Amino acid sequence: MMKMNTGTSPSVIGGGTSGNEWESRPGGMVVQRRTDQNSDVPRVFRVRVKYGSVYHEININSQSSFGELKKMLSDQVGLHHEDMKVLYKDKERDSKMFLDLCGVKDRSKLVVKEDPISQEKRLLAKRKNAAIEKASKSISDISFEVDRLAGQVSAFETVINKGGKVEEKSLVNLIEMLMNQLLRLDAIIADGDVKLMRKMQVQRVQKYVEALDLLKVKNSAKKVEVNKSVRHKPQTQTRFEQRDLLSFVEEEEEEPRNSNASSSSGTPAVVASKWEMFDSASTAKAAETVKPVPPRFKWEFFD
């Protein structure tokens, strides 16, 4: 190790010189000489701490704070360092205060007591932090689930915008799953940043639900158009099929007749049909002139 070289350099103060006020450090820097070389070295002393009826001796640095002393006593007295208060000269000392500045010396006596108010505050803060952590974890899980459902929304949107058709049941199920996530978000009670995170996720889920409602309307309109086209198409087919069937039957009936006539005469036969005309008015009058004939019975009389 390099040894520190000390030297003196004159300094003019009030027109005169004063020696032994400057010293040279190993790096060549000239600084003001310290009056006491060991004045900045912290001193370790032993203090006696009473908790209940038991005394504990603690070796601690003189420049330590009362908070550090509480942490050292925590394992020995069995209390959390935030649940205790330290008294010195019958006065409670703050955890941020230093021992030497408060007059604590070697073999000084301190008293430690349990602080129920601080304990209650610590437990409340612990519960609050646990609730915040739980809410944050729940929101993270919901966000992950919403990301997964958002992929399905994008897929349905692509299919419908390209002219395809999606089952309505699939859209309804996806809307229900998003609404379940919205109910989970509404059940979370949070403040501050966690509340802002919850609000962002709620707005996100609502946006996806609205998009699915629009896709549902488009999908229903396309379904109606497809049903109309399918309903008209079979009717035209059956009409043409019936017409073809009748023409086929007539041709089948005419072929045997033509073959029989040609075989008997040897010449092509001409079929002449005689149609008898009936007058609907004359038939109605004939029906009116016909009267029912009363029956004739032979009656035999007895005396």
Curated annotation (Swiss-Prot):
Location of the region described as Disordered in the Swiss-Prot/TrEMBL record? 1-27, 249-268
Which GO CC annotations does the UniProt entry carry?
cytoplasm
Q: Mind telling me which Gene3D superfamilies this protein's record contains?
A: BAG domain, Phosphatidylinositol 3-kinase Catalytic Subunit, Chain A, domain 1
Ranges where the Ubiquitin-like domain occurs: 45-119
Protein's job:
Co-chaperone that regulates diverse cellular pathways, such as programmed cell death and stress responses.
BAG domain boundaries: 138-216
- The record's gene field reads BAG3
Listed Polar residues bias regions: 1-11, 258-267
Q: Which GO terms describe its molecular function?
A: protein-folding chaperone binding
What is the protein's given name? BAG family molecular chaperone regulator 3
Species name: Arabidopsis thaliana (Mouse-ear cress)
Modification Phosphoserine occurs at: S263
Q: Which Pfam families match?
A: BAG
Q: Which domain of life is it from?
A: Eukaryota
Which key words tag this protein in UniProt?
Chaperone, Phosphoprotein
| Subunit note | Binds to the ATPase domain of HSP70/HSC70 chaperones. Interacts with HSP70-1.
Does the record bear Chaperone in its keywords? yes
Which PROSITE patterns is this protein grouped with? BAG (PS51035), UBIQUITIN_2 (PS50053)
